[in-house]
Amino acid sequence: MQAVVTGGAGFIGSNLVDSLLARGDEVTVVDNFASGKRENLSPAATLLEHDIREPFAVSADVIFHLAAQADVQTSMKRPEYDAAVNVVGTVNVLQAAPGAQVIFASSGGAGYGECVEPASEETPFLPESPYGIAKKCGEEYLAGWNRIHGTSHVSLRFANVYGPRQDSGLEGGVVAIFLERLARGEATLIFGDGSQSRDFVYVTDVVESLLTVAGAGGGPFNVGTGNDTTVSELHHACAAVAGVAAEPRHEVARLGDIQRSVLDVSRIERERGWRAQVTLEDGLRRTWAWMQEAQPA
């Protein structure tokens, strides 16, 4: 398979690139390194250094579209920039390789808004940030392309993804943020009282979901575990993995943050046979081990 990965130097993208290369696929990475890191890139992948806000052309069977402005707070402060990357960029991806399938990394957490029960794909999208609005718009473009052009593009609505190579500089990378602060002997920082909860899914499970839908249509599909963990519970789980006894520091809740986000993943289990395999405890252990190995000597 000839695969293109936008954002392929980033957290999820680079993990996907490694899996594609291990399968023997031909891989091109499209990245402008706004948040991606060159050290994440495999030399076996071809690099097209490009900003998706500008049109481009590639040869591909499948484009995994993971490039994004992924910070909710940035989207609140600079909605025009968020839309340029996440909406205009997605339109450019759709036009980059006519005939290629596009698999779009959408967002369950930012899209559904507050969840009383686990959100299914039929749950109305009620985004509470420009980031979530842009992801909804991207999904609409893919669905529209399918209707107009007969394509088989697919949107995957990710829960809160974590694991090796996650950037602690982005506010959505709470696991990386917590583990790095604990490694430095600093208190973790929780916005609000810690009762807010998220569905945390490990990056290798997310990569497998991307590979599972390649070549097939359908969707959209939620990608998560179906279980939520409070931020306070996450703090204690991270502290246990790091082997420290530490209490978090609390600050006021932030604009745009939601209280509960958890996804119903029964559709992708039923239609594609995908299910998350890595428990939170095991995923945190793997992430902590990677962090220890990645630290400079």
Where are these regions (language model features)?
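Hydrophobic alpha-helix immediately C-terminal to the catalytic Tyr-X-X-X-Lys motif of short-chain
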Residues: 137, 141, 145, 178, ...
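C-terminal substrate-binding subdomain of Rossmann-fold SDR/epimerase-dehydratase oxidoreductases
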Residues: 182-297
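N-terminal Rossmann-like NAD(P)+-binding domain of SDR-like oxidoreductases, especially those catalyzing
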Residues: 1-161, 210
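A conserved pocket-lining segment of Rossmann-fold NAD(P)-dependent short-chain dehydrogenase/reductase
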Residues: 74-75, 123, 151-167, 177-201, ...
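Conserved donor sugar-nucleotide recognition element shared by glycan-biosynthetic enzymes
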Residues: 130, 138, 171, 231, ...
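A conserved catalytic-core signature of glycosyltransferases
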Residues: 106-107, 114, 173, 196, ...
